[in-house]
């Protein structure tokens, strides 16, 4: 069957067929390519809006963009719409798709658009946010809406879609404005791809770290404490502690020095750094003795002050500081999401002060660090360089030097990378580390950032080999990004079945009766001396119930102890990952767990 053209590609810009005048452009076919899905999903957002308007004539619409894996639309409606209403909206969408309605585009001036939609306050909001000039409107049947496009030429291309959830969304993301209704959905070019995606979504629900965090007693949140402020329970704290200790050892082996800066700094320091002018809305401030202070959103200023605490020579460089730095950032309530988006979190943060000639060497060393750690947790990953944003400090030449150094390091390693134009932090370009989990979802975690600007702002110096004062380069570096986010991702990646070496409880010990508890506690103590946490299930319950409780906690290993095991000083082992049961002497078991702990290579 011949493929149908759904749009065209002009360099990196997708142009729908309604707008094409130059037929020499590259054709985008109706399939599951990135470009085609953008057109299909954008069009499906309008199809959904058309269906909603048909079912709820009073509905007014704000914006309906394409997002990763789908689309959404924000709108106002008098009726309360819940998950149960998605079925009838989908049914109406299918009717409209089967009607094969032509989708057309026309343009008017902004002033004409303001007049056309004068009785629609949400359209007025949209129009006030866009520049003067021509405004494009897409029309299908009786429905039309403001949109830049691109869109499919006909609703017949919109057959394989699914509305996934209903949520609330503040108008324009402003918590002080009204709450609109938001419906999310996704769409594909064929039934099989949609089915595969929905299967992944169902699996993701089972793996949701918020659900598993509760079931495995890792962490909790409390409204009296406040949103975005996780409380770590014993299991979660053990998991996190093991991760922290492992990373501490890796850092020390790689030449990093542990440091710790204050969490509260005078606003003067944030003014020098540029955070006050460029990042203030994301920070928390307070007054102490009529002096303004800011809680740190990043650790860099503290590390700069540690660098300045002594005279530095070229012989000292590179100087590597690392800290598990607790930071706070003001996040709107609507974007908070489990451990993925919080207001307080701990970064595995490091800053490397080096000479310009050492940049590439240090970036290469960081990339090796990243590779070792990601392989340890069975993550694949990719890199993306983020370049100078619109709001930035430092001149273009400095940015160019820094960006070039990052590209050269990645090229030397033969690593593929993308470019996120304008996605850098305000003080320097960066490499974003994006990991892929077991469900093939991509997550942005760590960063590597070259910074010439902060050393200049704080007048950092070192003495070179000619006894002259020079300015060092500063590399910002986080591998995990934050412990909270990484643990959330890891929990979903392994469905709560953590690797033995960081499992909060690695071994469940199940004594069959009271006579076997002493032996169970003896084993527990021996394991603890090896830094392996275990739990003895000593309640007066049936053996099957004890084992079931341990299995629900997804423990890597379960030991069952009865008369025979006590007499022979042995264990009946159930290995969850190997999916096997066997009897071992206690010495053999201890040797086995030592081997599992030694499998962690740095």
From Swiss-Prot:
It catalyses: tRNA(Thr) + L-threonine + ATP = L-threonyl-tRNA(Thr) + AMP + diphosphate + H(+). It comes from Campylobacter jejuni subsp. jejuni serotype O:23/36 (strain 81-176). It is found in: Cytoplasm. GO terms for molecular function: ATP binding; metal ion binding; threonine-tRNA ligase activity; tRNA binding. The keyword Cytoplasm applies. Zn(2+) binds at residues 300, 351, 476. Its main location: cytoplasm. Transmembrane segments: none annotated. Residues 208-499 are annotated as: Catalytic. It is an enzyme of class 6 (ligase). One of its GO terms (biological process) is threonyl-tRNA aminoacylation. Catalyzes the attachment of threonine to tRNA(Thr) in a two-step reaction: L-threonine is first activated by ATP to form Thr-AMP and then transferred to the acceptor end of tRNA(Thr). Also edits incorrectly charged L-seryl-tRNA(Thr). PANTHER family: THREONINE--TRNA LIGASE, CHLOROPLASTIC_MITOCHONDRIAL 2 (PTHR11451:SF44), THREONINE-TRNA LIGASE (PTHR11451). CDD domains: ThrRS_anticodon, ThrRS_core. Binds 1 zinc ion per subunit. Its EC number is 6.1.1.3. Its cofactor is Zn(2+). One of its GO terms (cellular component) is cytosol. Homodimer. This is Threonine--tRNA ligase. Belongs to the class-II aminoacyl-tRNA synthetase family. Keywords: Aminoacyl-tRNA synthetase, ATP-binding, Cytoplasm, Ligase, Metal-binding, Nucleotide-binding, Protein biosynthesis, RNA-binding, tRNA-binding, Zinc.
């Amino acid at each position: 069957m011949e493929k149908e053209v759904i749009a065209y590609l002009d360099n990196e810009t997708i142009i729908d067929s309604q707008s094409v005048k130059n037929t020499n452009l590259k054709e985008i076919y109706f399939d599951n390519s990135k470009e085609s899905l953008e057109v299909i999903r954008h069009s499906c957002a309008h199809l959904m809006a058309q269906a909603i308007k048909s079912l709820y004539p009073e509905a007014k619409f704000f914006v309906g963009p394409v997002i990763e894996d789908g689309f959404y639309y924000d709108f106002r409606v008098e009726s309360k719409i819940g998950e149960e209403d998605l079925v009838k909206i989908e049914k109406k969408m299918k009717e409209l798709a089967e009607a094969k309605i032509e989708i057309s585009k026309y343009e008017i001036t902004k002033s004409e658009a303001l007049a056309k939609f004068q009785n629609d306050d949400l359209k007025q909001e949209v129009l006030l946010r866009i520049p003067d000039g021509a405004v494009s409107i897409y029309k299908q049947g009786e429905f039309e809406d403001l949109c830049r496009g691109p869109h499919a030429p006909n609703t017949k291309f919109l057959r394989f879609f699914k509305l996934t959830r209903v949520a609330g969304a503040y108008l324009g993301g402003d918590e002080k404005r009204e709450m609109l209704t938001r419906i999310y959905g996704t769409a594909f070019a064929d039934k099989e791809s949609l089915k595969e995606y929905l299967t992944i979504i169902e699996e993701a629900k089972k793996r949701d770290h918020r659900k598993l965090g509760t079931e495995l007693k890792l962490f909790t949140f409390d409204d009296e404490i406040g949103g975005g402020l996780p409380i770590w329970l014993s299991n979660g704290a053990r998991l996190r502690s093991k991760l922290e200790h492992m990373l501490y050892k890796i850092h020390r082996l790689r030449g990093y020095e542990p440091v710790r800066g204050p969490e509260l700094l005078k606003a003067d320091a944030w003014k020098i750094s540029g955070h006050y002018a460029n990042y203030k809305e994301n920070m928390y401030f307070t007054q102490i003795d009529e002096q303004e202070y800011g809680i740190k959103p990043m650790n860099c200023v503290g590390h700069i002050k540690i660098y300045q605490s002594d005279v530095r020579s070229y012989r000292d460089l590179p100087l590597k500081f690392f800290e598990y730095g607790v930071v706070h950032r003001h996040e709107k309530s609507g974007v908070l999401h489990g451990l993925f988006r919080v207001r307080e979190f701990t970064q595995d943060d490091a800053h490397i002060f080096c000479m310009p000639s050492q940049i590439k060497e240090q970036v290469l060393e960081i990339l090796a660090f990243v590779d070792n750690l990601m392989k340890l947790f069975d993550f694949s990953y990719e890199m993306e360089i983020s370049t100078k944003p619109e709001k930035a400090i430092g001149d273009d030449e400095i940015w160019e030097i820094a960006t070039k150094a990052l590209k050269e390091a990645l090229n030397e390693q033969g690593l593929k990378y993308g470019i996120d134009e304008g996605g850098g932090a305000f003080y320097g370009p960066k490499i974003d580390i994006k990991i892929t989990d077991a469900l093939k979802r991509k997550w942005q975690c760590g960063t590597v950032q070259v910074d010439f600007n902060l050393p200049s702002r704080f007048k950092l110096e070192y003495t070179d080999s000619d006894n002259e004062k020079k300015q060092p380069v500063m590399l910002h570096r986080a591998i995990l990004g934050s412990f909270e986010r990484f643990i959330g991702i890891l929990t979903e990646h392994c469905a709560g079945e953590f690797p033995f070496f960081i499992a909060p409880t690695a071994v469940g010990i199940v004594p069959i009766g009271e006579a076997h508890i002493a032996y169970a506690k003896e084993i527990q103590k021996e394991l603890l001396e090896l830094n392996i946490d275990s739990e003895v299930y000593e309640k007066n319950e049936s053996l099957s119930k004890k084992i079931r409780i341990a299995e629900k906690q997804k423990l890597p290993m379960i030991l069952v102890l009865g008369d025979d095991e006590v007499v022979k000083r042995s264990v009946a082992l159930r290995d969850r990952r190997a999916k096997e049961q066997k009897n071992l002497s206690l010495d053999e078991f201890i040797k086995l767990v030592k081997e599992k702990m030694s499998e962690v290579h740095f």
